[in-house]
């Protein structure tokens, strides 16, 4: 996915790639272009743009169902994690992930009522739903959802709405306490710049408390 796809010359593993677009990614200015399959080992993606004083280069994104392993400044594609645990998804193979995550939890209801408390998470909000019914928002203290349900076996789904920082943010800016984000956040230099990735924690970081 890249901006100005129609101006780009794309070569993947030595083979020219048509820059025909197949939709957008997140923003109407970012276009998706289909690449050939990635092969095991080293892959080389070469993108050539016309560039001058008035030109700007923006980030590009490799999209697909895979995981990513980051070691310092190096990142490599891995298999998609089979399951996620409560905790930071950055350390579970999804460091750049900026979509939503649904945690599915089997529960047994005994008193026609279920309470779930998810008090420690990093994201915009959580919704809780039982058997895909109407979701209940978890966003303000005490971070609880109350759900009426028939006794028996159910699937509780906790959907975390993450943010786009680890996908689009200034992931090389050392100053993690910088709360204001603007153009200069992506132009850090000197001791404010890091070749290693500086991610923000993302996920439901503590096992939710469930009573039913």
Regions found by a protein language model. Give the residues of each.
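Short beta-strand segments within Ig-like beta-sandwich modules, predominantly Fibronectin type-III
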Residues: 21-25, 134-139
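An acidic-aromatic loop/edge-strand motif
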Residues: 2-4, 22-28, 33-106, 118-120, ...
């Amino acid at each position: 996915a890249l901006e100005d796809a129609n101006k780009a010359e794309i070569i993947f593993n030595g083979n020219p790639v048509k820059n025909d677009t197949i939709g957008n990614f997140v923003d109407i200015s970012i276009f998706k272009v289909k690449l050939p399959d990635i092969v095991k080992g080293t892959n080389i993606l070469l993108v050539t743009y016309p560039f001058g004083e008035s030109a700007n280069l923006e980030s590009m994104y490799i999209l697909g169902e895979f995981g990513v392993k980051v070691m310092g400044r190096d990142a490599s594609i891995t298999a998609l994690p089979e399951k996620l645990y409560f905790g930071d998804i950055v350390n579970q193979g999804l460091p750049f992930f900026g979509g939503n995550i649904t945690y599915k939890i089997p529960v047994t209801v005994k008193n026609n009522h279920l309470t779930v408390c998810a008090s420690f998470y990093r994201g915009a909000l959580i919704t809780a739903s039982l058997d895909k019914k109407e979701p209940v928002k978890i966003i303000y203290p005490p971070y609880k959802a109350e759900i009426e349900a028939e006794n028996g076996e159910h699937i509780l789904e906790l959907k975390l709405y993450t943010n786009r920082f680890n996908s689009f943010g200034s992931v090389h800016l050392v100053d993690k306490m910088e709360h204001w984000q603007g153009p200069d956040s992506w132009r850090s230099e000197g001791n404010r710049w890091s070749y290693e990735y500086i991610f923000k924690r993302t996920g439901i970081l503590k096992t939710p408390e469930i009573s039913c």
